[in-house]
Every structure is written in C-alpha cells, then in structure tokens.
Amino acid sequence: MIEIKGLYKSFDDKTVLSDINADFANGKTNLIIGQSGSGKTVLMKCIVGLLTPEKGEVLYDGRNLVLMGKKEKKMLRKEMGMIFQSAALFDSMTVFDNVMFPLNMFSNDILRDRIKRAMFCLDRVNLGEAKDKFPGEISGGMQKRVAIARAIALNPQYLFCDEPNSGLDPKTSLVIDDLIHDITQEYNMTTIINTHDMNSVLGIGEKVIYIYEGHKEWEGTKDDIFTSTNERLNNFCLLYTSDAADD
C-alpha cells in the first residue's frame, strides 16, 4: 500500500498541491485523473520521488520516502516498475534486450535465469515471437506491451503508469488497460495510473482520485462516478468522454 498524508508542493511560491491525502491499495488499479495543469503529474512525481514535497509524507508500506537517504531510495526504486507516456524503449535494442535491460542492471540472478524471466514477461504480454524485432518494426500498441513486460521484469511491488494509452486507438487502449489490470491482480501490486482517458477510468478504475487545481476534489470507484453530485468531476467526465467519442 502507498499512503499520501498532508502533501504540499510549490514552485516559485505558487502552491501546486495542497493538503493531498490518499491511499492506494495492493492488487487494485488506482487512477489519478484531472485536467492539464491540475497537479496530477506533479503528484505522481512526488509519489515516485522525482520531486520532493515541502510538507507531508509518502509512505510505501509504512516507509516514508520523503525521509529516505539516497541508498534507501535506490533500494526502493528496485521495487518499482514504470510505464511512461511514450513507451521509452531503446531503439537500438531488440524487444528482448529491452526487457533484459533492467534485469542486467539490477538483478543478481545468473544469466540463464535472467533470460528465462525476460521470456516469461514477453510471453505474458503475448510478444514472445517478437523478441528479435526492434521497436521501430512493431506497432505502438506492441511497444506499450514491451514496456509493460520491461516494467514487471524485476517483479515490482509498485507499478506506475503515466498516460499509458497516449497515442493509441480505443481498441488497443482496451488491450493495454486489461493487461495492466490483470497483471496488477496477478502480482498483487500497488498500481497507480495517471490518465485523463475516461474509457480507462470507467473500465478499470477500482479507485479514482480527481485532482482539481492542486486539491483532491473527489475520490471513489468507477461506479461511484455515475452517481456523483460533484459538479467539477461531472464536467470533467463529460468533457473527456466527449473527446473520446470524437476520436
């Protein structure tokens, strides 16, 4: 579980996050939503340790990231998997070598076991047969699946996804959503997804937090959205559902 307590973050005397409190459970897909400039990306960066809040706690199963030294943070990052808005694959490496990269960097396993793990992860995302291809030779959706395989290579406890469906068509987005959801349950990971894709929210949003102008405006489940009386949330959902329909 990841817990956020009384989180504040400012830039140049402008408060970007104000008194954010939230908890994200294991084995569930937790979604952070909000318009551009709402603070959701800053919140994600504070959670993973890329930014340091002025005040508050970020607890990883009771361990406060804010108070950790460099060595502790390095150890914690080995427990994290990350999927970026762009797949962020190495173009000069094959699909297989991309998945092997974190294993070669951080795993103490012998080479045979690292290879076995990489192939297991590729097979899990149905890309075993594409292992010798380069990123430029496969589709955008396949690249995202490679990114998922790489993210789970070290068997992380925590998975962070930044706009994982960006640039994908609705059908491919559904495949990626289902894959992230299923893997989250299989590994009992704490998964946090930063998105404004309402199809994702309504499809896999087991917990949803809506950020508005740096404040936590609303939280609930995907089903709670349909009965929400929060006008700001309702306007956001209407806007981005309409955008998805137009696409």
Annotate each language-model stretch with its function.
Residues 56-64:
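Conserved ABC transporter NBD signature motif
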Residues 170-172:
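Helix N-cap at the start of a conserved alpha-helix in ABC-type nucleotide-binding domains
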Residues 48:
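Helix-to-loop junction immediately C-terminal to a conserved catalytic motif
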Residues 153-157:
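A short, proline-enriched helix->beta-strand linker immediately N-terminal to the Walker B motif
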Residues 134-138, 142:
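Conserved ABC ATPase signature
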Residues 159-162:
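Catalytic Walker B motif of ABC-type/P-loop ATPase nucleotide-binding domains
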Residues 240-245:
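Conserved small/polar residues in nucleotide/adenosyl-binding loops
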